[in-house]
Amino acid sequence: MPTFHIEMFEGRSADQKRKLVEEVTRVTCETLGCAPGAVDIIIAEVKRENWATGGVLWSEQK
């Protein structure tokens, strides 16, 4: 069973997350030939103060 871990900044709506998991599931099933019930998706929402790129926290980027 494919399992996807998606990390993203917090703040997206339930509708946006619903659409995301529907599309990831659809493409996975088309590509791998598996049933939708075999696809697990875990969304982890991260605060900008806990994510850095290039040594700079996203909460401090301009």
Swiss-Prot record:
InterPro entries: 4-OT, 4-OT-like_dom, Tautomerase/MIF_sf
Classification via NCBIfam families: PRK00745.1, PRK02220.1, taut
Keyword Isomerase among record annotations: yes
Keyword DNA damage appears in the UniProt entry: no
Extent of the signal sequence: none
SUPFAM superfamilies, per the entry: Tautomerase/MIF
The entry's keywords: Isomerase
Protein name stated in the entry: Probable tautomerase RSc0807
GO molecular function: isomerase activity
Species of the source: Ralstonia nicotianae (strain ATCC BAA-1114 / GMI1000)
Domain of life: Bacteria
Active site: P2 (proton acceptor)
